[in-house]
């Protein structure tokens, strides 16, 4: 670095802009650029290390959020469709994700699952999925929950074909809610009827 400074001092300084440009060009083309290579590598490292850390931290955060979302989806499948045929469990997972994609519902799986809306008849907030108002416990080591977790992952990562395209609602076959009259029936799977 000291050699570079001495060479700069040795230069005769031109008095015009054109002279400055010619001097700089000739200096650049005739000098050894290995010193600049070191500075370039150092500068690149200074930029890449923080960028790499930022990417790793964001990836870890996204991975943690994905796990949380998958857990909420699995719990919803477990509570809403446990005991249903596999097609019914996949359909419940699809409805949950269809709601996330819809502008009429919250933007994350956990927010959709635990959403509460005001019910004029009951004069209180009620859960979109009935199990969220009841006992929320589940056996994470049970085969039913393991199946729900597997289904959640497959539907979340779009590894299966949709069964109930665009369905946003469903109810059990043994009830007849008034809102169902205004919806378009998409499918009947197991003990659930699905609507757009």
PLM features: residue spans?
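Bacterial extracytoplasmic/cell-wall-associated proteins, especially those involved in peptidoglycan
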Residues: 2-40, 50-196
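Single-pass alpha-helical transmembrane signal-anchor segments in small membrane proteins across taxa
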Residues: 46-48
């Amino acid at each position: 670095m000291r050699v570079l400074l001495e060479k700069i001092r040795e230069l005769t300084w031109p008095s015009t802009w054109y002279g400055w440009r010619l001097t700089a060009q000739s200096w650049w083309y005739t000098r050894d650029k290995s010193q600049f290579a070191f500075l370039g590598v150092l500068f690149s490292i200074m930029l890449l290390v923080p960028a790499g850390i930022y990417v790793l931290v964001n990836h870890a955060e996204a991975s943690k959020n994905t796990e949380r979302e998958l857990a909420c989806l699995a719990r919803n499948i477990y509570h809403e469709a446990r005991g249903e045929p596999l097609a019914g469990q996949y359909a419940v997972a699809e409805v949950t994700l269809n709601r996330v994609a819809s502008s009429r519902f919250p933007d994350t799986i956990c927010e959709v699952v635990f959403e509460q809306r005001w019910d004029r008849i009951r004069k209180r907030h009620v859960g979109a999925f009935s199990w969220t108002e009841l006992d929320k416990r589940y056996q994470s080591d049970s085969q039913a929950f393991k199946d729900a977790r597997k289904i959640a992952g497959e539907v979340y990562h779009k590894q299966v074909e949709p069964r109930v395209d665009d369905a946003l609602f469903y109810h059990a076959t043994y009830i007849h809610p008034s809102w169902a009259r205004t919806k378009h029936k998409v499918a009947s799977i197991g003990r659930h009827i699905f609507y757009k």
